[in-house]
């Protein structure tokens, strides 16, 4: 008896879906079957959307955001406060803060957090480009909106040290972000409160 229940194309779809965070082999099979059942209304539009993303999505060369233009729509928005940069670990955190609609500032995506055990040091993150933005622009405040984890706090302290010779105010998110919590899982009200009550480092 063959160990493959379906054809190679369907098996490949299941294997790729299983790589998505939150999906396992069983949930990937269920998702694949659902997509196949909804071929015209979901599978085909999803395939077209994925192909469009492959063709058009890029990383913003200024802040590290994901968009279909470079610079991204946030960096091109003239209504943003050019003197304030919110530093986040990942694009998911940027999107979470944007949903809170509290501060119309600029962003800087680090692309992760310092984690020596995982081999992630300063050279693997977008820290040098952050320093360059401070050098080249009249930045007055850096808001460190990193996750309240050991690695996140280590990253915050490292960035603070790197910017210690500049006359820039450095703040971090205050109450509302639980220790060990990650921004993408917080509700909009909690994020808004944390931004409003940020504190100096």
Swiss-Prot record:
PROSITE patterns: RECR, TOPRIM
Zinc finger (C4-type) in chain: 60-75
Pfam family, one: RecR_HhH
Stretches assigned to the Toprim domain: 83-178
InterPro entries given in the database record: DNA_Rcmb_RecR, Rcmb_RecR, Rcmb_RecR_Znf, TOPRIM_dom, TOPRIM_RecR
Keywords: DNA damage, DNA recombination, DNA repair, Metal-binding, Zinc, Zinc-finger
GO molecular function: DNA binding; zinc ion binding
A Gene Ontology biological process term: DNA recombination
SMART domains per the UniProt record, alphabetical: TOPRIM
PANTHER family for the chain: RECOMBINATION PROTEIN RECR
Function: May play a role in DNA repair. It seems to be involved in an RecBC-independent recombinational process of DNA repair. It may act with RecF and RecO.
Protein family per UniProt: Belongs to the RecR family.
Record protein name field: Recombination protein RecR
Organism listed in the record: Bartonella quintana (strain Toulouse)
Gene label: recR
